[in-house]
Regions:
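Short functional linear motifs
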Residues: 18, 29-32
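A short, surface-exposed loop/turn module that caps and links secondary-structure elements
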Residues: 40-67
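Residues in soluble alpha-helical coiled-coils and helical-bundle/repeat scaffolds
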Residues: 26-29, 47
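Residue-level signal for pocket-adjacent positions within structured domains
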Residues: 19, 51, 55, 97
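PIN-domain endoribonuclease scaffold, especially VapC-family toxins
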Residues: 32-40
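Alpha-helix C-capping/helix-to-loop hinge sites
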Residues: 20-27, 63
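Enriched for short, Lys/Arg-rich terminal
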Residues: 1-10, 22-24, 32, 68-73, ...
Length: 107
C-alpha cells in the first residue's frame, strides 16, 4: 500500500503576506521560491528544523519567524483548528498557519 503524504496544517496568507509575495517575485526569483518553500514546510510541520525558526517577542509575541534572506523574514503564527478544517481526503488538519508577512525584517 503506498504511503500518502498529507498536509497537516492549512496555510492562510494575510493581505499583507500576499502583497509581500508579489514584492518578492519582483525582487528576484530566488526570494519568491524560498517563500514558497517555507509555505510548503509550515504546511507539513511548522515546528520542523531546519530551516530554523525563532519565537518572536514584543508586538509580535505569539508569532514565529524564518529567514528568507538577510533582509526578509517569513513571519507566521500557528493556531488550533477550531473551525475543523479537513484536507482533500476529509482528514482533519492539526491547525492553521497564519502568515502575517514576508517582506523586510520585524517592524
Amino acid at each position: 500500500m503506498p504511503i500518502a503524504f498529507i498536509s497537516m496544517y492549512k496555510v492562510i496568507l494575510s493581505k499583507q503576506a500576499i502583497k509581500d509575495l508579489e514584492k518578492l517575485k519582483r525582487a528576484g526569483k530566488s526570494y519568491a521560491k524560498k517563500a514558497k518553500e517555507l509555505i510548503d514546510i509550515v504546511k507539513d510541520n511548522p515546528w520542523i528544523n531546519p530551516p530554523s525558526y525563532e519565537k518572536l517577542v514584543g508586538d509580535l509575541q505569539g508569532f514565529y519567524s524564518r529567514r528568507i534572506n538577510d533582509q526578509h523574514r517569513f513571519v507566521y503564527a500557528v493556531l488550533p483548528n477550531d473551525c475543523n478544517f479537513v484536507d482533500e481526503q476529509g482528514i482533519p488538519l492539526q491547525g492553521i498557519v497564519h502568515v502575517l508577512k514576508m517582506w523586510t525584517h520585524y517592524e
